[in-house]
Amino acid sequence: MNRLTGKNHYFLRQKIAPWLILALPIFFTLWLKYYPIFKAFYISFFDYDPIHQPGKFVGLQNYVNMFSTEYYWDAWKNSFVFLFLQIAMVFLIPVIQALFLNELRRKNLISTMYLLPTLIPTTINVIIWRWVWHPDYGIANLVVKFFGGQPQTWLSDPNLVKFCIIFPGIIGGGVAVLLYLSAIQGISPDIVESAALDGCTGWKRIWYITLPNIRFVIFIQFVIAVSTAMQMLDAPYMFASGGPSGASTTQGIYIYNSFQQDYNYGRGSAASVILMLVVFVMTMIQMHFENAEKE
């Protein structure tokens, strides 16, 4: 009897208890994460009417109409430009900063300086940088004029607005720098010393020892950078509302405008589904190459 009771207790503790603990988080994950995805997929086949739901069934017409507009493809082009800038300026540069920061003696003090800008709310950060880019009294044009250049209308120039939106990420990318720095400091000193004895120092040490040992952190940050860039909404919208002339309109802004300005829920849902599929495929490709390198 005691043995049977013990088995029941073991079964409850090892098999049932974990599921009971995870039941509520799983429920909210399904409700708040996966249900909206299936709901968006469902709505994308309707001329959705929020009052008389779900509205008229139109099949793939929302997708056809969306693919036939130049505005939609311009939003994709802008999203990929932002992706390139995000990788170049907010992904690669923090890696380089962390490598140099690791060579300094007072790295703890400087690490704190990197962390402080991340505490500034996005709204306040945008207000500060809009002032920096102001064509009349902004710091950016003061610097340009100091070096003999011509003042620029930064946020009103289609060729400059993307750079202006991404550039603050270099200053606010302190968390990424600290993650890379932590990964670098986590490399075993024995590995570094052995490499030094074999003549692997300087740039060779960075290329053959440091970067391979922080590859997983780089991969995670790369996935986050890709996902963030493809879904970018807040910064382009607060800086330029997708302008000028749609030059900073991303897929995020396109979807937002479809819902909030045009009240075209079917088109917005269709765009959301396509964006989700693109991000998913890109993430799977990245994971495939990461796994291939491990093998």
Regions found by a protein language model. Name each.
Residues Y10-E295:
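A structural signal for multi-pass alpha-helical bundles of membrane permease subunits
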Residues M1-L12:
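Short, Lys/Arg-rich, polar N-terminal cytosolic tail immediately upstream
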